[in-house]
Amino acid sequence: MAISTFNLNNSKPSQKWRWVTADLHIHSIYSDGGFTPAQILKYAAAHFLDAVAIADHSEIKGAMEGKTLTEKELHLPLVLKAQEVSAGNRFHFLLVNCNTPQSDFNKENILSCLTEHRRQGGITILAHPWTMPDAKWARSCLRDLLAADLVDGIELFNSAALEISNVRDIWHRIWEEWIGPYQLAVFGGSDFHHLHKGRYIGTGRTYLKVYSYSEQGIIDALRARRCVAGLFGFKNDKESGLLWGQEPWSADLQRFRENLQKKLIGLSRYPSVYRRLFLNLYEAGHYQYLADLL
């Protein structure tokens, strides 16, 4: 088998439980990003991502362009239609599986807008939660949304967090205040705009347990909250290589990773170039890709 030309997308069985890796927060030139959708997909494919959500600010042109590209080139990652929408003062939400652009929310319409988004099959994620204003109106708004079951999860791992000195304390506080009590899913995304300070596509990511490798299979996993957030690839930072998620999915992914560790012990039968590739894939968190190769 020629490892250099191995096509992961074509190798995926259509009906089998597996982990897919997605970056759910990427900006393109259609908002304030520096990459075209084509460049995003090329980079994501080269870094073994199975899916990406192109999430421009109140805009889905980038996502639609990306989806058109994937229909022509099957080796590219799947594209989820998404957008990032502001409720004011860095209080942002990721709307995944959306069909129309959504202008910024206000206090009067956010509940009705997210209710309609949910009715149409959409997923709602609170983005970079540490930037949410510590104001009564924002916290009250989030509680109302959670009480109405309109928020599916929180983007706990966003590569911007690694610029915060006490980020672990912040993560634990968010877990204790919001994620744990409301049993929210834990998501990861790079919030990629440009190649800057290690904030690369795939740095923040989400592992999703899917039965069908398809856009609908990924949406189903998001809705069922079968996911674990990962943070990888931030060079020279002690926080690289983290996995956080709700049970049973966190333990499930951990067992999957431990089984791969056992298989890696027997790498002596492979040429050295393959051994280096396998170890690099493991250290970079590309677990399902590695499992398919082994």
Can you say where each PLM-predicted feature lies in the sequence?
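Divalent metal-dependent hydrolysis catalytic cores, especially in the metallo-beta-lactamase
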Residues: 29, 41-61, 121-125
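Histidine-centered divalent metal-coordination motifs
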Residues: 25-27, 57, 128, 193
